Protein backbone atom coordinates (compact mmCIF):
# COMPACT_ATOMS: atom_id res chain seq x y z
CA UNK A 1 0.00 0.00 0.00
CA UNK A 2 1.14 3.59 -0.60
CA UNK A 3 -0.20 6.52 1.40
CA UNK A 4 -1.23 9.67 -0.48
CA UNK A 5 -1.75 12.89 1.52
CA UNK A 6 -3.44 16.06 0.32
CA UNK A 7 -3.56 19.22 2.45
CA UNK A 8 -7.34 19.50 2.36
CA UNK A 9 -8.44 15.88 2.09
CA UNK A 10 -8.48 12.86 4.36
CA UNK A 11 -5.99 9.99 4.25
CA UNK A 12 -6.28 7.83 1.12
CA UNK A 13 -4.62 4.46 0.58
CA UNK A 14 -3.85 3.19 -2.93
CA UNK A 15 -2.70 -0.19 -4.19
CA UNK A 16 0.91 0.59 -4.99
CA UNK A 17 4.24 -0.19 -3.41
CA UNK A 18 4.45 -0.53 0.35
CA UNK A 19 5.66 2.33 2.51
CA UNK A 20 6.63 1.11 5.95
CA UNK A 21 7.46 2.85 9.23
CA UNK A 22 5.52 5.92 8.10
CA UNK A 23 4.73 8.67 10.59
CA UNK A 24 3.47 12.22 10.26
CA UNK A 25 2.23 15.16 12.29
CA UNK A 26 0.46 18.45 11.71
CA UNK A 27 1.97 21.87 12.25
CA UNK A 28 -1.03 23.79 13.55
CA UNK A 29 0.23 25.90 16.45
CA UNK A 30 3.15 28.19 15.55
CA UNK A 31 3.13 29.64 19.07
CA UNK A 32 4.64 26.37 20.25
CA UNK A 33 7.90 27.67 18.79
CA UNK A 34 8.37 29.16 22.24
CA UNK A 35 9.92 25.79 23.09
CA UNK A 36 11.69 25.39 19.79
CA UNK A 37 15.18 25.17 21.36
CA UNK A 38 13.96 22.25 23.47
CA UNK A 39 12.29 20.33 20.66
CA UNK A 40 14.63 20.93 17.74
CA UNK A 41 15.67 17.30 17.80
CA UNK A 42 12.19 16.07 16.83
CA UNK A 43 10.38 18.86 14.97
CA UNK A 44 11.18 20.45 11.61
CA UNK A 45 11.90 24.19 11.59
CA UNK A 46 8.75 26.12 12.40
CA UNK A 47 9.43 28.63 9.65
CA UNK A 48 9.32 25.86 7.04
CA UNK A 49 5.57 26.38 6.53
CA UNK A 50 3.15 29.31 6.68
CA UNK A 51 1.47 29.83 10.03
CA UNK A 52 -1.84 28.39 8.80
CA UNK A 53 -0.32 25.46 6.93
CA UNK A 54 -1.76 21.97 7.49
CA UNK A 55 0.75 20.21 5.26
CA UNK A 56 1.75 16.73 6.49
CA UNK A 57 5.43 15.98 6.95
CA UNK A 58 6.92 12.53 6.53
CA UNK A 59 9.35 11.68 9.32
CA UNK A 60 10.48 8.38 7.81
CA UNK A 61 9.58 6.47 4.66
CA UNK A 62 11.11 3.07 3.94
CA UNK A 63 10.19 1.46 0.64
CA UNK A 64 9.56 -2.21 0.07
CA UNK A 65 8.91 -4.18 -3.14
CA UNK A 66 9.37 -1.12 -5.30
CA UNK A 67 8.42 -1.48 -8.92
CA UNK A 68 10.38 -0.06 -11.82
CA UNK A 69 10.87 3.66 -11.44
CA UNK A 70 9.33 3.80 -7.95
CA UNK A 71 12.71 4.54 -6.40
CA UNK A 72 12.72 7.92 -8.13
CA UNK A 73 9.27 8.64 -6.67
CA UNK A 74 10.49 7.94 -3.15
CA UNK A 75 13.50 10.19 -3.70
CA UNK A 76 11.16 12.90 -4.96
CA UNK A 77 8.88 12.52 -1.93
CA UNK A 78 11.86 12.75 0.38
CA UNK A 79 12.96 16.03 -1.21
CA UNK A 80 9.45 17.52 -1.23
CA UNK A 81 8.10 16.39 2.12
CA UNK A 82 10.76 14.60 4.12
CA UNK A 83 12.79 15.76 7.08
CA UNK A 84 15.12 13.51 9.02
CA UNK A 85 14.32 12.50 12.56
CA UNK A 86 16.60 14.40 14.90
CA UNK A 87 19.07 12.87 17.29
CA UNK A 88 17.64 11.98 20.69
CA UNK A 89 19.27 14.00 23.42
CA UNK A 90 18.81 13.32 27.10
CA UNK A 91 17.48 16.26 29.08
CA UNK A 92 19.74 17.77 31.70
CA UNK A 93 18.46 16.67 35.11
CA UNK A 94 18.94 18.19 38.54
CA UNK A 95 20.62 14.97 39.65
CA UNK A 96 23.37 15.63 37.10
CA UNK A 97 23.81 19.19 38.32
CA UNK A 98 23.94 18.45 42.05
CA UNK A 99 24.75 14.74 42.15
CA UNK A 100 28.54 14.86 41.97
CA UNK A 101 30.94 14.74 44.88
CA UNK A 102 31.26 18.54 44.73
CA UNK A 103 27.45 18.96 44.66
CA UNK A 104 27.56 21.09 41.52
CA UNK A 105 30.51 23.40 42.18
CA UNK A 106 32.24 22.20 39.01
CA UNK A 107 29.32 23.62 37.00
CA UNK A 108 29.64 27.18 38.34
CA UNK A 109 29.50 29.56 35.39
CA UNK A 110 27.63 27.16 33.11
CA UNK A 111 24.41 28.26 31.40
CA UNK A 112 21.67 25.66 31.88
CA UNK A 113 18.04 25.01 31.09
CA UNK A 114 16.13 23.05 33.75
CA UNK A 115 12.52 21.88 33.61
CA UNK A 116 10.55 20.70 36.62
CA UNK A 117 7.83 21.45 39.15
CA UNK A 118 7.75 24.21 41.73
CA UNK A 119 8.06 22.90 45.28
CA UNK A 120 8.22 26.25 47.10
CA UNK A 121 8.27 29.95 46.24
CA UNK A 122 9.16 32.80 48.57
CA UNK A 123 9.91 36.47 47.95
CA UNK A 124 12.26 38.67 49.95
CA UNK A 125 12.27 42.35 48.96
CA UNK A 126 13.59 42.37 45.37
CA UNK A 127 14.61 38.69 45.22
CA UNK A 128 12.42 35.63 44.70
CA UNK A 129 13.56 32.10 45.55
CA UNK A 130 11.95 29.18 43.74
CA UNK A 131 12.71 25.55 44.63
CA UNK A 132 12.34 23.27 41.60
CA UNK A 133 12.34 19.47 41.52
CA UNK A 134 12.31 17.30 38.39
CA UNK A 135 12.07 13.90 40.10
CA UNK A 136 15.60 12.82 39.22
CA UNK A 137 16.75 13.13 42.83
CA UNK A 138 15.55 14.13 46.26
CA UNK A 139 17.26 17.54 46.16
CA UNK A 140 15.59 20.63 44.78
CA UNK A 141 17.42 23.22 42.72
CA UNK A 142 17.15 26.68 44.21
CA UNK A 143 16.49 29.29 41.53
CA UNK A 144 17.14 32.94 42.39
CA UNK A 145 15.18 35.58 40.45
CA UNK A 146 15.38 39.32 40.37
CA UNK A 147 12.95 41.70 38.70
CA UNK A 148 15.11 42.01 35.58
CA UNK A 149 14.67 38.30 34.71
CA UNK A 150 12.54 37.64 31.65
CA UNK A 151 9.17 36.28 32.80
CA UNK A 152 9.34 37.86 36.25
CA UNK A 153 5.89 39.32 35.60
CA UNK A 154 4.54 35.77 36.02
CA UNK A 155 5.76 35.84 39.61
CA UNK A 156 4.12 39.20 40.21
CA UNK A 157 0.84 38.06 38.64
CA UNK A 158 0.70 34.91 40.78
CA UNK A 159 0.98 32.49 37.85
CA UNK A 160 3.80 30.59 39.52
CA UNK A 161 2.43 28.57 42.43
CA UNK A 162 3.48 25.38 44.18
CA UNK A 163 2.92 22.51 41.75
CA UNK A 164 3.29 24.55 38.56
CA UNK A 165 5.60 23.19 35.87
CA UNK A 166 8.27 25.58 34.64
CA UNK A 167 11.21 25.84 32.29
CA UNK A 168 14.06 27.92 33.71
CA UNK A 169 17.17 29.22 31.97
CA UNK A 170 20.07 30.71 33.84
CA UNK A 171 23.63 30.40 35.11
CA UNK A 172 24.91 28.20 37.92
CA UNK A 173 26.50 30.26 40.70
CA UNK A 174 27.90 29.43 44.12
CA UNK A 175 25.16 29.69 46.71
CA UNK A 176 25.34 32.33 49.41
CA UNK A 177 23.25 30.12 51.68
CA UNK A 178 24.35 27.07 53.67
CA UNK A 179 21.71 24.54 52.56
CA UNK A 180 23.19 24.01 49.10
CA UNK A 181 26.49 24.52 47.34
CA UNK A 182 25.08 26.01 44.13
CA UNK A 183 21.95 27.70 42.83
CA UNK A 184 20.62 28.89 39.49
CA UNK A 185 20.63 32.63 38.77
CA UNK A 186 17.53 32.92 36.59
CA UNK A 187 17.65 34.80 33.31
CA UNK A 188 14.35 33.53 31.90
CA UNK A 189 11.41 31.55 33.27
CA UNK A 190 8.47 30.09 31.36
CA UNK A 191 5.36 28.63 32.98
CA UNK A 192 4.70 25.41 31.08
CA UNK A 193 1.62 24.47 33.10
CA UNK A 194 -0.10 26.52 35.76
CA UNK A 195 -1.27 24.86 38.97
CA UNK A 196 -4.70 25.53 40.41
CA UNK A 197 -4.86 26.84 43.96
CA UNK A 198 -6.76 23.69 44.97
CA UNK A 199 -3.57 21.61 44.58
CA UNK A 200 -3.98 19.13 47.48
CA UNK A 201 -0.35 18.58 48.46
CA UNK A 202 0.84 22.14 48.98
CA UNK A 203 1.49 21.53 52.66
CA UNK A 204 4.95 20.38 53.60
CA UNK A 205 3.62 17.28 55.35
CA UNK A 206 0.49 15.25 54.67
CA UNK A 207 -0.28 11.77 55.94
CA UNK A 208 0.38 8.69 53.85
CA UNK A 209 -3.23 7.66 54.42
CA UNK A 210 -4.37 10.88 52.75
CA UNK A 211 -1.89 10.44 49.92
CA UNK A 212 -3.33 7.00 49.11
CA UNK A 213 -6.46 8.86 48.01
CA UNK A 214 -4.26 11.02 45.75
CA UNK A 215 -2.13 8.27 44.21
CA UNK A 216 -1.90 10.24 40.96
CA UNK A 217 -0.15 13.11 42.76
CA UNK A 218 1.77 11.43 45.58
CA UNK A 219 4.94 10.75 43.52
CA UNK A 220 5.57 14.50 43.76
CA UNK A 221 6.25 14.20 47.50
CA UNK A 222 9.69 13.48 48.91
CA UNK A 223 8.74 10.09 50.36
CA UNK A 224 7.02 8.66 47.32
CA UNK A 225 9.54 10.11 44.91
CA UNK A 226 12.30 8.38 46.88
CA UNK A 227 10.33 5.11 46.97
CA UNK A 228 9.85 5.26 43.19
CA UNK A 229 13.56 5.79 42.55
CA UNK A 230 14.60 2.98 44.89
CA UNK A 231 12.00 0.68 43.36
CA UNK A 232 13.39 1.50 39.93
CA UNK A 233 16.94 0.77 41.10
CA UNK A 234 15.89 -2.54 42.65
CA UNK A 235 14.23 -3.57 39.37
CA UNK A 236 17.33 -2.61 37.40
CA UNK A 237 19.60 -4.45 39.85
CA UNK A 238 17.36 -7.52 39.60
CA UNK A 239 17.78 -7.76 35.84
CA UNK A 240 21.47 -6.94 36.17
CA UNK A 241 22.10 -9.73 38.70
CA UNK A 242 20.36 -12.43 36.70
CA UNK A 243 21.72 -11.32 33.34
CA UNK A 244 25.28 -11.25 34.69
CA UNK A 245 24.68 -14.71 36.20
CA UNK A 246 23.73 -16.22 32.84
CA UNK A 247 19.94 -16.34 33.31
CA UNK A 248 17.47 -15.75 30.48
CA UNK A 249 14.44 -13.55 31.14
CA UNK A 250 11.14 -15.20 30.19
CA UNK A 251 7.77 -13.45 29.92
CA UNK A 252 5.20 -15.60 31.71
CA UNK A 253 1.51 -15.23 30.78
CA UNK A 254 -0.86 -13.13 32.84
CA UNK A 255 -3.91 -15.15 31.78
CA UNK A 256 -3.72 -18.84 32.65
CA UNK A 257 -5.85 -21.93 33.18
CA UNK A 258 -3.56 -23.31 35.91
CA UNK A 259 -3.44 -22.65 39.64
CA UNK A 260 0.19 -22.83 40.69
CA UNK A 261 -0.50 -22.65 44.41
CA UNK A 262 -3.63 -24.82 44.38
CA UNK A 263 -5.31 -22.42 46.79
CA UNK A 264 -8.15 -21.36 44.50
CA UNK A 265 -7.74 -17.64 45.32
CA UNK A 266 -7.75 -16.51 41.69
CA UNK A 267 -9.44 -13.76 39.72
CA UNK A 268 -11.59 -15.19 36.95
CA UNK A 269 -11.24 -13.80 33.43
CA UNK A 270 -14.49 -14.12 31.48
CA UNK A 271 -16.52 -12.50 28.72
CA UNK A 272 -19.76 -14.13 29.85
CA UNK A 273 -20.50 -11.16 32.11
CA UNK A 274 -21.32 -7.84 30.38
CA UNK A 275 -18.43 -5.39 30.25
CA UNK A 276 -18.61 -1.97 31.87
CA UNK A 277 -19.96 -0.17 28.78
CA UNK A 278 -22.76 -2.68 28.34
CA UNK A 279 -25.94 -3.19 30.35
CA UNK A 280 -24.66 -4.18 33.78
CA UNK A 281 -28.18 -4.97 34.97
CA UNK A 282 -28.34 -8.10 32.85
CA UNK A 283 -29.82 -10.96 34.83
CA UNK A 284 -27.44 -13.61 36.08
CA UNK A 285 -29.72 -16.04 34.28
CA UNK A 286 -28.38 -14.69 30.98
CA UNK A 287 -25.02 -16.38 31.62
CA UNK A 288 -24.99 -19.57 29.52
CA UNK A 289 -25.31 -22.78 31.50
CA UNK A 290 -25.04 -26.48 30.84
CA UNK A 291 -27.96 -28.84 31.21
CA UNK A 292 -26.77 -29.51 34.73
CA UNK A 293 -27.08 -25.84 35.64
CA UNK A 294 -23.36 -25.12 35.74
CA UNK A 295 -21.70 -22.27 33.86
CA UNK A 296 -21.07 -23.30 30.26
CA UNK A 297 -17.43 -22.30 29.92
CA UNK A 298 -17.31 -23.65 26.37
CA UNK A 299 -19.07 -20.45 25.29
CA UNK A 300 -16.51 -18.24 26.99
CA UNK A 301 -13.64 -16.53 25.15
CA UNK A 302 -11.07 -19.24 25.91
CA UNK A 303 -13.53 -22.13 25.86
CA UNK A 304 -12.62 -23.03 29.44
CA UNK A 305 -12.23 -21.28 32.82
CA UNK A 306 -9.36 -18.77 32.75
CA UNK A 307 -7.76 -16.76 35.53
CA UNK A 308 -5.23 -14.06 36.27
CA UNK A 309 -1.96 -15.73 37.19
CA UNK A 310 -0.93 -16.21 40.80
CA UNK A 311 2.61 -17.14 39.79
CA UNK A 312 4.78 -17.51 36.71
CA UNK A 313 6.65 -20.45 38.21
CA UNK A 314 5.11 -23.34 36.27
CA UNK A 315 5.67 -21.54 32.97
CA UNK A 316 9.19 -20.66 34.05
CA UNK A 317 9.94 -24.34 34.64
CA UNK A 318 9.16 -25.12 31.02
CA UNK A 319 11.93 -22.80 29.84
CA UNK A 320 14.35 -23.86 32.56
CA UNK A 321 14.19 -27.39 31.16
CA UNK A 322 15.37 -26.00 27.83
CA UNK A 323 17.54 -22.96 28.62
CA UNK A 324 18.89 -24.14 32.01
CA UNK A 325 18.58 -20.95 34.09
CA UNK A 326 15.70 -18.50 33.59
CA UNK A 327 13.75 -15.92 35.55
CA UNK A 328 10.39 -14.20 35.28
CA UNK A 329 9.60 -10.73 36.59
CA UNK A 330 6.03 -9.53 36.24
CA UNK A 331 2.64 -8.89 37.85
CA UNK A 332 0.70 -11.58 39.70
CA UNK A 333 -2.74 -11.54 41.28
CA UNK A 334 -4.35 -13.04 44.38
CA UNK A 335 -8.06 -12.77 45.17
CA UNK A 336 -7.28 -13.04 48.86
CA UNK A 337 -9.65 -10.87 50.90
CA UNK A 338 -6.93 -9.66 53.28
CA UNK A 339 -7.29 -5.97 54.03
CA UNK A 340 -3.96 -5.62 55.83
CA UNK A 341 -0.75 -3.63 55.51
CA UNK A 342 1.02 -6.76 54.17
CA UNK A 343 -1.26 -7.84 51.33
CA UNK A 344 -2.06 -6.64 47.82
CA UNK A 345 -4.38 -8.13 45.22
CA UNK A 346 -1.91 -7.17 42.46
CA UNK A 347 1.82 -7.31 43.01
CA UNK A 348 5.05 -8.11 41.18
CA UNK A 349 7.01 -11.33 41.53
CA UNK A 350 10.60 -12.29 40.75
CA UNK A 351 10.79 -16.02 40.07
CA UNK A 352 14.04 -17.65 38.92
CA UNK A 353 14.27 -21.33 37.97
CA UNK A 354 17.57 -23.24 37.98
CA UNK A 355 17.99 -26.50 36.05
CA UNK A 356 20.33 -29.21 37.35
CA UNK A 357 20.00 -27.70 40.83
CA UNK A 358 18.89 -28.75 44.31
CA UNK A 359 17.68 -26.89 47.39
CA UNK A 360 21.20 -25.92 48.45
CA UNK A 361 21.77 -24.27 45.06
CA UNK A 362 18.43 -22.52 45.43
CA UNK A 363 19.29 -21.07 48.84
CA UNK A 364 22.70 -19.94 47.61
CA UNK A 365 21.15 -18.16 44.63
CA UNK A 366 18.52 -16.44 46.78
CA UNK A 367 21.18 -15.26 49.22
CA UNK A 368 23.48 -13.96 46.49
CA UNK A 369 20.58 -12.16 44.81
CA UNK A 370 19.40 -10.39 47.96
CA UNK A 371 22.89 -9.30 48.95
CA UNK A 372 23.57 -8.03 45.42
CA UNK A 373 20.47 -5.85 45.09
CA UNK A 374 20.75 -4.47 48.63
CA UNK A 375 24.37 -3.46 48.07
CA UNK A 376 23.46 -1.98 44.68
CA UNK A 377 20.84 0.27 46.24
CA UNK A 378 23.17 1.36 49.04
CA UNK A 379 25.82 2.27 46.46
CA UNK A 380 23.53 4.00 43.96
CA UNK A 381 20.72 5.59 45.99
CA UNK A 382 22.70 7.22 48.77
CA UNK A 383 20.66 10.41 49.03
CA UNK A 384 17.34 8.56 49.08
CA UNK A 385 18.62 6.01 51.59
CA UNK A 386 19.83 8.80 53.88
CA UNK A 387 16.32 10.26 53.65
CA UNK A 388 14.79 6.93 54.71
CA UNK A 389 17.35 6.60 57.49
CA UNK A 390 16.40 10.03 58.82
CA UNK A 391 12.63 10.12 58.34
CA UNK A 392 11.34 6.54 57.96
CA UNK A 393 13.49 4.05 59.89
CA UNK A 394 16.51 5.17 61.84
CA UNK A 395 19.36 2.72 61.38
CA UNK A 396 18.08 1.24 58.12
CA UNK A 397 21.40 1.78 56.34
CA UNK A 398 23.24 -0.14 59.05
CA UNK A 399 20.63 -2.92 58.94
CA UNK A 400 20.91 -3.27 55.19
CA UNK A 401 24.70 -3.17 55.34
CA UNK A 402 24.58 -6.16 57.70
CA UNK A 403 22.43 -8.04 55.18
CA UNK A 404 24.85 -7.26 52.37
CA UNK A 405 27.94 -8.26 54.35
CA UNK A 406 27.04 -11.00 56.84
CA UNK A 407 26.57 -14.70 56.16
CA UNK A 408 23.00 -16.00 56.21
CA UNK A 409 22.01 -18.75 58.64
CA UNK A 410 19.91 -21.82 57.86
CA UNK A 411 18.02 -24.19 60.12
CA UNK A 412 15.39 -26.89 59.72
CA UNK A 413 11.69 -26.31 60.29
CA UNK A 414 11.79 -28.75 63.22
CA UNK A 415 14.56 -26.72 64.88
CA UNK A 416 12.61 -23.51 64.30
CA UNK A 417 9.58 -24.98 66.07
CA UNK A 418 11.78 -25.97 69.01
CA UNK A 419 13.16 -22.41 69.26
CA UNK A 420 9.64 -20.96 69.25
CA UNK A 421 8.38 -23.42 71.87
CA UNK A 422 11.25 -22.45 74.17
CA UNK A 423 10.77 -18.72 73.60
CA UNK A 424 9.82 -16.70 76.64
CA UNK A 425 7.13 -14.98 74.61
CA UNK A 426 3.38 -15.32 74.16
CA UNK A 427 2.34 -15.61 70.51
CA UNK A 428 -1.11 -14.88 69.09
CA UNK A 429 -0.95 -17.97 66.87
CA UNK A 430 -0.19 -21.49 68.17
CA UNK A 431 3.22 -23.08 67.68
CA UNK A 432 3.05 -26.74 66.74
CA UNK A 433 4.90 -29.06 64.37
CA UNK A 434 2.81 -29.34 61.23
CA UNK A 435 1.44 -25.79 61.35
CA UNK A 436 2.74 -23.04 59.11
CA UNK A 437 4.78 -20.26 60.67
CA UNK A 438 3.02 -16.92 61.01
CA UNK A 439 4.61 -13.52 60.57
CA UNK A 440 5.06 -13.07 64.32
CA UNK A 441 6.95 -16.38 64.49
CA UNK A 442 9.16 -15.49 61.55
CA UNK A 443 10.03 -12.08 62.94
CA UNK A 444 10.85 -13.50 66.36
CA UNK A 445 13.30 -15.95 64.81
CA UNK A 446 15.14 -13.39 62.69
CA UNK A 447 14.89 -10.32 64.95
CA UNK A 448 15.20 -11.79 68.44
CA UNK A 449 16.48 -15.35 68.32
CA UNK A 450 19.25 -14.49 65.83
CA UNK A 451 19.74 -10.79 66.55
CA UNK A 452 18.53 -9.29 63.28
CA UNK A 453 20.29 -11.66 60.88
CA UNK A 454 18.50 -13.14 57.86
CA UNK A 455 17.59 -16.78 58.47
CA UNK A 456 16.59 -19.48 55.99
CA UNK A 457 14.24 -22.18 57.29
CA UNK A 458 14.17 -25.38 55.26
CA UNK A 459 12.45 -28.79 55.04
CA UNK A 460 8.84 -27.95 55.84
CA UNK A 461 6.04 -30.50 56.40
CA UNK A 462 4.68 -31.44 52.99
CA UNK A 463 1.07 -31.01 54.14
CA UNK A 464 1.46 -27.23 54.37
CA UNK A 465 3.33 -26.78 51.10
CA UNK A 466 2.41 -26.82 47.41
CA UNK A 467 2.10 -29.95 45.27
CA UNK A 468 5.16 -29.27 43.12
CA UNK A 469 7.73 -29.35 45.94
CA UNK A 470 10.09 -32.33 46.03
CA UNK A 471 9.34 -34.89 48.73
CA UNK A 472 12.26 -35.64 51.04
CA UNK A 473 13.37 -39.16 51.87
CA UNK A 474 11.54 -39.08 55.22
CA UNK A 475 8.20 -38.93 53.40
CA UNK A 476 6.97 -36.20 55.78
CA UNK A 477 8.79 -33.09 54.61
CA UNK A 478 9.58 -31.40 51.32
CA UNK A 479 12.71 -29.64 50.06
CA UNK A 480 11.30 -26.17 50.64
CA UNK A 481 12.81 -23.03 52.12
CA UNK A 482 11.70 -19.61 53.34
CA UNK A 483 14.10 -16.71 53.78
CA UNK A 484 13.21 -14.57 56.80
CA UNK A 485 14.42 -10.99 57.22
CA UNK A 486 13.92 -8.41 60.00
CA UNK A 487 10.75 -6.26 59.93
CA UNK A 488 9.20 -8.30 57.10
CA UNK A 489 9.36 -11.96 58.05
CA UNK A 490 9.21 -14.15 54.96
CA UNK A 491 10.75 -12.35 51.99
CA UNK A 492 11.61 -15.28 49.72
CA UNK A 493 10.00 -18.69 49.39
CA UNK A 494 11.45 -21.47 47.27
CA UNK A 495 11.89 -25.17 46.80
CA UNK A 496 13.41 -27.93 44.80
CA UNK A 497 10.74 -29.00 42.32
CA UNK A 498 9.48 -32.56 42.13
CA UNK A 499 11.12 -33.97 39.00
CA UNK A 500 9.88 -37.58 39.42
CA UNK A 501 6.76 -38.16 37.32
CA UNK A 502 5.20 -40.90 39.42
CA UNK A 503 5.72 -39.00 42.69
CA UNK A 504 4.25 -35.81 41.22
CA UNK A 505 1.21 -37.66 39.85
CA UNK A 506 0.63 -39.29 43.22
CA UNK A 507 0.80 -35.90 44.93
CA UNK A 508 -1.75 -34.42 42.53
CA UNK A 509 -4.07 -37.36 43.22
CA UNK A 510 -3.56 -36.95 46.96
CA UNK A 511 -4.60 -33.30 46.80
CA UNK A 512 -7.48 -34.12 44.40
CA UNK A 513 -6.12 -31.78 41.74
CA UNK A 514 -7.14 -32.38 38.14
CA UNK A 515 -4.13 -33.92 36.39
CA UNK A 516 -5.58 -33.05 32.99
CA UNK A 517 -5.11 -29.35 33.81
CA UNK A 518 -1.40 -30.02 34.37
CA UNK A 519 -0.80 -32.31 31.39
CA UNK A 520 1.88 -30.04 29.95
CA UNK A 521 3.57 -29.68 33.35
CA UNK A 522 3.70 -33.46 33.69
CA UNK A 523 5.19 -33.69 30.19
CA UNK A 524 8.30 -31.95 31.51
CA UNK A 525 8.85 -35.03 33.67
CA UNK A 526 8.27 -37.41 30.76
CA UNK A 527 10.73 -35.85 28.36
CA UNK A 528 14.21 -35.32 29.76
CA UNK A 529 13.36 -34.43 33.35
CA UNK A 530 16.13 -32.94 35.49
CA UNK A 531 16.46 -31.89 39.13
CA UNK A 532 15.59 -28.22 39.29
CA UNK A 533 14.76 -25.58 41.86
CA UNK A 534 13.56 -22.01 42.13
CA UNK A 535 12.13 -19.35 44.37
CA UNK A 536 9.64 -16.53 44.40
CA UNK A 537 10.14 -13.05 45.79
CA UNK A 538 7.36 -10.51 46.25
CA UNK A 539 8.92 -7.37 44.80
CA UNK A 540 6.85 -5.00 46.94
CA UNK A 541 8.01 -6.72 50.12
CA UNK A 542 11.57 -6.25 48.93
CA UNK A 543 10.91 -2.53 48.43
CA UNK A 544 9.44 -2.40 51.94
CA UNK A 545 12.49 -4.13 53.35
CA UNK A 546 14.89 -1.72 51.66
CA UNK A 547 12.98 1.52 52.32
CA UNK A 548 11.55 0.82 55.78
CA UNK A 549 8.03 1.73 54.63
CA UNK A 550 5.64 -0.18 56.89
CA UNK A 551 2.58 -0.39 54.62
CA UNK A 552 2.85 -2.34 51.38
CA UNK A 553 0.30 -0.02 49.74
CA UNK A 554 2.90 2.73 49.81
CA UNK A 555 5.58 0.93 47.78
CA UNK A 556 3.57 0.26 44.60
CA UNK A 557 2.36 3.09 42.35
CA UNK A 558 -1.33 2.15 42.33
CA UNK A 559 -2.27 -0.37 45.05
CA UNK A 560 -5.05 -2.84 44.36
CA UNK A 561 -6.74 -4.04 47.55
CA UNK A 562 -10.20 -5.30 48.59
CA UNK A 563 -12.86 -2.72 47.65
CA UNK A 564 -10.23 -0.44 46.11
CA UNK A 565 -9.34 -0.26 42.42
CA UNK A 566 -9.16 3.51 41.92
CA UNK A 567 -6.85 5.12 39.35
UniProtKB/Swiss-Prot annotation:
Please give the catalytic activity noted in the UniProt record: tRNA(Asn) + L-asparagine + ATP = L-asparaginyl-tRNA(Asn) + AMP + diphosphate + H(+)
Q: Which residues form a coiled coil?
A: none
- SUPFAM superfamilies given for it? Class II aaRS and biotin synthetases (SSF55681), Nucleic acid-binding proteins (SSF50249)
* Top-rank taxon, per record: Eukaryota
Compartment list:
Plastid, Chloroplast; Mitochondrion
UniProt KW keywords:
Aminoacyl-tRNA synthetase, ATP-binding, Chloroplast, DNA-binding, Ligase, Mitochondrion, Nucleotide-binding, Plastid, Protein biosynthesis, Transit peptide
Which N-terminal stretch is annotated as signal sequence?
none
Q: Name one GO cellular component term.
A: chloroplast stroma
> What is a biological process (GO) this protein takes part in?
plant ovule development
Q: What class of enzyme is it?
A: ligase
The residue ranges marked as DNA-binding region are 113-191
The consequence of inactivating this gene is: Lethal. In heterozygous plants, aborted ovules.
Q: From the UniProt record, which GO molecular function terms apply? A: asparagine-tRNA ligase activity; ATP binding; DNA binding
Q: Name the family the entry cites.
A: Belongs to the class-II aminoacyl-tRNA synthetase family.
Name of protein: Asparagine--tRNA ligase, chloroplastic/mitochondrial
Q: What is the lineage of its organism?
A: Eukaryota, Viridiplantae, Streptophyta, Embryophyta, Tracheophyta
Amino acid sequence: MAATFLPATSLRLTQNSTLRFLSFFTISNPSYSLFRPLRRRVLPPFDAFPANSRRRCFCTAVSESLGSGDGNKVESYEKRFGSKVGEFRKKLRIAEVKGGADEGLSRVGQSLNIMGWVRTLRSQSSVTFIEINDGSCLSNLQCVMTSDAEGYDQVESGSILTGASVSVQGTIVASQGTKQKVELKVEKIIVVGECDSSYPIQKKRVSREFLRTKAHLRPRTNTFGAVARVRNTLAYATHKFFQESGFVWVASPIITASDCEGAGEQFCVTTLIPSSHENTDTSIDAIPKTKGGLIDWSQDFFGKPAFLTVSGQLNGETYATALSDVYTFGPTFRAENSNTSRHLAEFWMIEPELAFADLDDDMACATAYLQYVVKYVLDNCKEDMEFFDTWIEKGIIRRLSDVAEKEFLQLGYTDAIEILLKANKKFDFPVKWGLDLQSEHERYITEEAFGGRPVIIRDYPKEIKAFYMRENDDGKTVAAMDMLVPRIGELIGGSQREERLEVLEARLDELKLNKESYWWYLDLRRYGSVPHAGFGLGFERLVQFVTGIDNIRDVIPFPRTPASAEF
